[in-house]
């Protein structure tokens, strides 16, 4: 006489969870700008632009990078004096108000692969030029020799460009804020902080 095998309810629950988890892995996740009356949004590249104290700061999500939450940052100095900041001081705030520091350079290869080279969205330079023709994104920024290797200094009417990588929070959080703090004026020591507000869309 044949015995009927019974499937226990807990195994059914586990199976359903695994199926749902597998489906979520194939969801498209995009980081997009949140409307801010104090900011300019570039719709094609999803970039956010803030202007304060003669400094223009831009943040653009790199949605083609899947292993981490990645952002391109551009700082343009329109003042007549030098400004400086430290990239390592930048951080991200998630929906739960948890602070996440950038991934250390020594771990970039682990997360991104040996041959990874970050690129800004191709629409971004065109949109920036249309918005402000005095800011040109062509050509690499000119680095300055410094005693402090952690500090980035920007000459008047020049820009700095860099990339920030964070352990992936866009899976669990619906909102992200990128903070670029303490851009210091070498003229009067004024410090300027920029906050970029993004939302996470899944589909």
Regions found by a protein language model. Give the residues of each.
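Asparagine-centered strand-capping/turn motif at beta-strand->loop junctions
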Residues: 75-79
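Bacterial N-terminal signal peptides that target proteins for export
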Residues: 2-12
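Soluble periplasmic/extracytoplasmic beta-strand elements of cell-envelope proteins
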Residues: 58, 70-74, 84, 91
């Amino acid at each position: 006489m044949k015995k009927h095998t019974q499937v226990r309810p807990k195994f059914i629950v586990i199976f359903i969870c695994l199926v749902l988890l597998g489906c979520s892995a194939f969801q498209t996740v995009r980081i997009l700008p949140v409307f801010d009356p104090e900011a300019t949004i570039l719709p094609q590249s999803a970039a956010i632009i803030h202007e304060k104290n003669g400094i223009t700061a831009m943040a653009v999500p790199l949605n083609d990078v899947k292993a981490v939450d990645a952002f391109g940052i551009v700082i343009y100095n329109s003042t007549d004096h030098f400004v400086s900041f430290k990239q390592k001081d930048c951080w991200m705030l998630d929906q739960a108000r948890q602070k996440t520091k950038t991934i250390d350079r020594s771990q970039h290869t682990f997360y991104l692969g040996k041959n990874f080279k970050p690129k800004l969205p191709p629409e971004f330079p065109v949109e920036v030029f249309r918005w402000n023709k005095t800011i040109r994104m062509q050509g690499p920024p000119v680095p300055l020799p410094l005693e402090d290797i952690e500090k980035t200094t920007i000459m008047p009417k020049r820009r700095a460009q860099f990339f920030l990588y964070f352990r992936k929070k866009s899976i669990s959080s619906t909102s992200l804020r990128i903070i670029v703090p303490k851009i210091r004026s070498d003229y009067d020591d004024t410090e300027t902080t920029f906050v970029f507000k993004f939302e996470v869309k899944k589909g």
